[in-house]
Amino acid sequence: MRTFTWRKGSLSKVNTCYVLAGGKSKRFGEDKLLYEIKGKKVIERVYETAKSVFKEVYIVAKDREKFSFLNAPVVLDEFEESASIIGLYTALKHAKEENVFVLSGDLPLMKKETVLYVLENFKEPVSVAKTEKLHTLVGVYSKKLLEKIEERIKKGDYRIWALLKDVGYNEVEIPEELRYTLLNMNTKEDLKRILAIENHY
């Protein structure tokens, strides 16, 4: 594993993380965020990783009680629809600072090193992780995007990638040795892969 260093410039700009936890887990067949891997719920693993980097970490969700076991501050989604862009909008609207880190709640293999790598390569207004695909829910977003996001939500356009194409963004190419940390747990097949990787590391 390579060694990562913190750049003061990046960290001074990004002190807050929002973990998005408002999805329905339809493809997984049960609530994936509450699924336990080695004695810890998926959302718990992601939250602890975020806490190891940021001064403030919030959970963005539709149900405050559901995540009470984390003893973490919960921000309730601004809209009823279950879409990632709703969580993003809620996070940016709640944010006190200009830039915040956004992290999907279904990344049980996420590591501090991956988060730091994205931070080190942060450029405004948006920087998101990239492997063979773009990971729009692992990155830094600016509050300046609020108006454009709201416009898209009102039109029923929930595509984050379309938003990024519109506003411009920076792709942070994740090193090969950290790419496994970006594996989403959407299905039971994903879970099998995640458990195999977890046992390997």
UniProtKB/Swiss-Prot annotation:
Top EC class for this record: transferase
Its required cofactor(s), as named, are:
Mg(2+)
Q: Which reaction does it catalyse?
A: Mo-molybdopterin + GTP + H(+) = Mo-molybdopterin guanine dinucleotide + diphosphate
Residue spans crossing the bilayer = none
Q: Which InterPro entries match?
A: MobA-like_NTP_Trfase, Molybde_CF_guanTrfase, Nucleotide-diphossugar_trans
Enumerate the Gene Ontology biological process terms.
Answer: Mo-molybdopterin cofactor biosynthetic process
Name its cellular compartments: Cytoplasm
Return the EC number: 2.7.7.77
Q: Which GO terms describe its cellular component?
A: cytoplasm
Record keywords, A-Z: Cytoplasm, GTP-binding, Magnesium, Metal-binding, Molybdenum cofactor biosynthesis, Nucleotide-binding, Transferase
Q: What is its main location?
A: cytoplasm
Q: State its role.
A: Transfers a GMP moiety from GTP to Mo-molybdopterin (Mo-MPT) cofactor (Moco or molybdenum cofactor) to form Mo-molybdopterin guanine dinucleotide (Mo-MGD) cofactor.
Q: Which PANTHER family match?
A: MOLYBDENUM COFACTOR GUANYLYLTRANSFERASE (PTHR19136:SF81)
Q: Which family does it belong to?
A: Belongs to the MobA family.
Which NCBIfam families does this one have? PRK00317.1-3
Q: What is this protein called?
A: Probable molybdenum cofactor guanylyltransferase
Instruction: State the species of origin.
Output: Aquifex aeolicus (strain VF5)
**Gene for this protein?**
mobA
